[in-house]
């Protein structure tokens, strides 16, 4: 089978990747296991810096998952203390800068002239992309780490306590609330909902995937993706902390911690295939390939139709890779030492590497064509261009 890169790239919002920490713990800067040393390789692509900017004081000691967002020719970025900036995607010139009176904790979502974000205080804020002015603020049940997700009418927000709140996109008024039971111990962070016009797909810390009717918030179906096993609470963690990925033909791909990757038929939840890969990252689909970053930072390419493994790269094992992005035929990742890595999507070979900042990269890159925007933990936002 060949990888058809001309097909639409199925990318989902990346700022929702959960940190590999237990709830209530502070973030650390290094992996628990010894990461592989970087090795030399035959470079087939180069990463050239186009511009860089400093976004406040970065992601904070807890490494809040405040991934940037891009719409059109503007990049939006924030720091953990409430600074939000809009930058020209081509040259990094600042378009505006606002200081919110509350600490930011979620990735940003930029859509239809608005920027949406969540805070540590359980607020959701909508900003006007033109000048950063606040359109509305709404209160949800608890801290928000997952990027708010929108369809034409609603903004869906998943809080760290597992509650899902639907807000009116135009006004912030609450439309409905869905609550779920949480295990005693969970990973730090939550899954990010996948929202389409009729329904919302929600991954929960108890290992269940729930499909909610967007008219009412009532469940249409739910499925146990990951089943707790083992004696200790840590062994029994089964969080669905990545974002489900849906394709135009109605397939749904879901990752889970300590469990498996599952392909489902989206309307009823019937299982198409499953693969025994543990992942807390959002997967990426390009052409006929599904790319998964495992919990030990191996990168695996699966046949999206059958689940068969096509290739596996362990060169970056235990380097705390971010969720994948895609640029100019390559997968793009950040790591805990602040490197950006390229892996050839067809072959699985290392293709390029550049270092952004030694503070590390814990949020997924944002890409547009052959352009990569990546925000380091200290707040440095760097734009790189991939060239063969």
Positions of PLM-derived features:
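Short loop/turn segments that connect beta-strands within beta-propeller blades
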Residues: 88-91, 128-131, 168-172, 214-217, ...
């Amino acid at each position: 089978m060949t990888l058809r890169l001309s097909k639409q790239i199925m990318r989902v919002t990346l700022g929702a990747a959960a940190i590999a920490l237990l709830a209530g713990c502070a973030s650390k800067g290094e992996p628990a296991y010894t990461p592989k040393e970087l090795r030399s390789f035959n470079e087939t692509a180069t990463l050239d810096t186009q511009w860089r900017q400093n976004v406040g004081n970065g992601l904070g000691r807890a490494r809040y998952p405040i991934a940037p967002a891009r719409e059109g020719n503007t990049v939006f970025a924030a720091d953990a203390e409430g600074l939000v900036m809009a930058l020209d995607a081509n040259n990094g010139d600042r378009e505006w800068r606002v200081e919110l009176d509350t600490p930011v904790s979620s990735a940003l979502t930029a859509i239809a002239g608005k920027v949406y974000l969540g805070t540590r205080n359980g607020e959701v804020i909508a900003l006007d992309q033109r000048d950063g002015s606040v359109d509305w603020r709404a209160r949800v049940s608890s801290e928000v780490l997952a990027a708010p997700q929108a369809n034409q009418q609603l903004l869906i927000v998943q809080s760290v306590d597992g509650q899902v709140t639907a807000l009116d996109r135009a006004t912030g008024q609450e439309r409905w609330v869905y609550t779920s039971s949480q295990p005693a111990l969970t990973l730090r962070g939550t899954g990010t909902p996948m929202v389409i016009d009729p329904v919302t797909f929600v991954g929960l810390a108890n290992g269940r995937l729930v499909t909610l009717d967007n008219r009412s918030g009532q469940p249409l179906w739910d499925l146990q993706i990951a089943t707790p096993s083992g004696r200790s609470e840590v062994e029994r963690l089964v969080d669905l902390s990545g974002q489900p990925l849906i394709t135009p033909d109605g397939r749904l791909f879901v990752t889970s911690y300590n469990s498996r990757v599952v392909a489902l038929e989206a309307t009823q939840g019937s299982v198409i295939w499953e693969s025994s890969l543990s992942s807390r990252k959002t997967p990426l689909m390009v052409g006929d390939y599904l790319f998964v970053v495992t919990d030990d930072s191996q990168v695996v390419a699966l046949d999206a139709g059958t689940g068969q493994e096509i290739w596996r790269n362990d060169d970056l094992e235990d380097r705390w890779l971010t969720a994948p992005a895609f640029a100019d035929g390559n997968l793009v990742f950040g790591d805990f030492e602040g490197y950006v890595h390229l892996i050839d999507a067809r072959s699985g070979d290392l293709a390029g590497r550049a270092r952004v900042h030694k503070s590390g990269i814990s949020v997924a890159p944002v890409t547009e064509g052959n352009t990569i925007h990546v925000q380091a933990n200290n707040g440095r936002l760097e734009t790189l261009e991939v060239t063969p």
